[in-house]
Amino acid sequence: MYEAPFEIHVHGEIPLRSEVVLAQVQEALKPIWVYAGAKSLASAARSLYEEEPGIRFSATDHVLSLCWTVAGDEDFRQAVEDACMALNEIASEGAPLEVSFYDIQFDEDKASSDEESRDDFMMCFIGPTPAAILQVQRDMMVRDVVHMMERHFDAAELDPVVQAIDQLFAGRYESLVLSMQLGKPPKGSGGGPGHGGGRKPRHLH
């Protein structure tokens, strides 16, 4: 019997356009609920873990919230990327979506010194336009860099760092606009896998 090697946790809040209805959300998320072996979004919305809210759509607040774990393999990456492409069409602004892969076959207590877990992490970005996606990428980078450097510098000293990040993203945006005008695919990805050291704790909300 096949045993999925990972528990995959998907986490994020995506603002949606005010006219978006549940049927559109279900269609956009179809790649991941089909991956989970479900026949509808409703039947897949519950997480593997009862303490996690799962997949929720608020028609009042126009927000799609995901705090959801599913058993799976590396091929889930394609499913979530397909879902993100569809969510771009109904998103109202840029938002990040975190996807964490937990190696359920790895036991830290029993592993030898040369064994490593296959835990992994990827960050996806969703937005109605390339500019909206770049904006949320920029905001996250500024937050992370400032948070790290504030341990050693006063906040006022970090203005040149923020300006440098802004210049980098301004250059990327100009390249993107130019490539779209020329009908060429833009350089650089809208997000991808990131690798961190050590096992990350699971999100619990």
Indicate where each model-derived feature is located.
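Short, extreme N-terminal segment that most often corresponds to the first beta-strand
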Residues: 1-33
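Generic alpha-helix signal with a bias toward terminal, lower-confidence helices
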Residues: 22, 26-28, 41, 45, ...
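A common structural junction motif
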Residues: 30-40, 88-95
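Charged interaction segments
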Residues: 44-205
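Generic alpha-helical propensity signal that fires on short helical segments
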Residues: 26-34, 84-86, 117
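Short, solvent-exposed aromatic-acidic interface loops
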Residues: 27-35, 102-109
